[in-house]
UniProtKB/Swiss-Prot annotation:
Motif NPA 1 per UniProt: ranges: 112-114
InterPro entries reported for this sequence: Aquaporin-like, Aquaporin_transptr, MIP, MIP_CS
An example Gene Ontology molecular-function term: channel activity
Primary location recorded for the protein, binned into one broad class: membrane
Motif NPA 2, chain ranges: 227-229
Protein name per UniProt: Aquaporin NIP4-1
Keywords of this entry: Membrane, Repeat, Transmembrane, Transmembrane helix, Transport
PROSITE patterns in the cross-refs: MIP (PS00221)
Length: 286
């Protein structure tokens, strides 16, 4: 106990033990470290939870997009087969409009395993855990779409709404057509994906037009799939696997080559711009 200048009594704690002071400082440091660790753990859990939420949403969107595209593609093909009310160009138009609508409404969905695999191969898309989840969602959406088509349309067993190579052309020509069409489609997709000026609506219309136009060209030979999910869903539900390997291998191989061509063109633009001393506003490509 002591007295200050005003004559008031003030309690003074005197620490006479240096070791005690050291222990107190260490305890304070330990407490601060634990508080920081707890805060970091809470932030980590919150961030992880948010990331999982976004991943679940993306996978659900992928499944929904695949369902819509495959459902309306199959319905249009079945209407042509059952009633003859739609011509093949009209079927392609329905597919193009569906793709454009889905991309404009849901945003940058793939709804095509070949697209997802290509973006992952060129490191524009994470392999784990998104790649298997996206592909699984695409196939699940396709299967559900085909089951829904059967429930709504009730086709006969001889009605076919999938894609299969035309018998007279064998397998070589359908494979080549699917390969080339998939390569061109990937060039369009990569261009839209890396063009910052193209919004969802414009990009959706461009990709939808490409799908419809290419389908119109190669449809008489291969059915115009360019999408493994579009073929695998009907093949599994209907139990018809004629040439199904074509529609798995050709789109993936074609899109890998298409992305490579797109990258080569963009690289050549950069080289020319560098040699000419100008700048070219070209974003990265798959």
């Amino acid at each position: 106990m002591t007295t200050d200048h005003a004559g008031k009594k003030v309690d003074v704690v005197v620490v006479g033990n240096v070791d005690g002071e050291h222990v107190g400082v260490e305890q304070a440091r330990h407490d601060l470290h634990e508080e920081a660790a707890a805060a970091a753990a809470a932030d980590h859990h919150a961030t992880r939870g948010l990331a999982i939420g976004f991943l679940i949403r993306e996978v659900m969107v992928e499944g929904l997009a695949s369902f819509l595209v495959v459902f309306w593609s199959c319905v249009a093909a079945l209407m042509q087969e059952m009633y003859g009310t739609l011509t093949f160009p009209m079927v392609c138009l329905v597919v193009a409009m569906t793709v454009a609508f889905v991309l404009s409404w849901l945003g940058p969905a793939h709804f095509n395993p070949a697209v997802t695999i290509t973006f992952a191969a060129y490191r524009r898309f994470p392999v784990w855990p998104k790649l298997p989840l996206y592909v699984a969602a695409q196939l699940a959406g396709s299967l559900l779409a085909c089951l829904s088509v059967n429930a709504v349309m009730r086709p006969r067993h001889d009605h076919f709404y999938g894609t299969a190579p035309v018998v007279v052309h064998g397998t070589r020509l359908p494979f080549l057509m699917e390969f080339l069409a998939s390569a061109v489609l990937m060039i369009v997709i990569a261009t839209v994906a890396t063009d910052g000026t193209a919004g969802k609506t414009v990009g959706g219309i461009a990709i939808g037009a490409a799908v419809g136009g290419l389908g119109l060209v190669i449809g008489p030979v291969s059915g115009g799939s360019m999408n493994p999910a579009r073929t695998l869903g009907p093949a599994i539900v209907l139990g018809r696997y004629d040439g199904v390997w074509i529609y798995v291998v050709a789109p993936v191989a074609g899109m890998l080559v298409g992305a490579l061509c797109n990258r080569a063109v963009r690289l050549s633009h950069r080289i020319v711009a560098f040699l000419c001393g100008t700048s070219v506003g070209i974003a990265g490509s798959p």
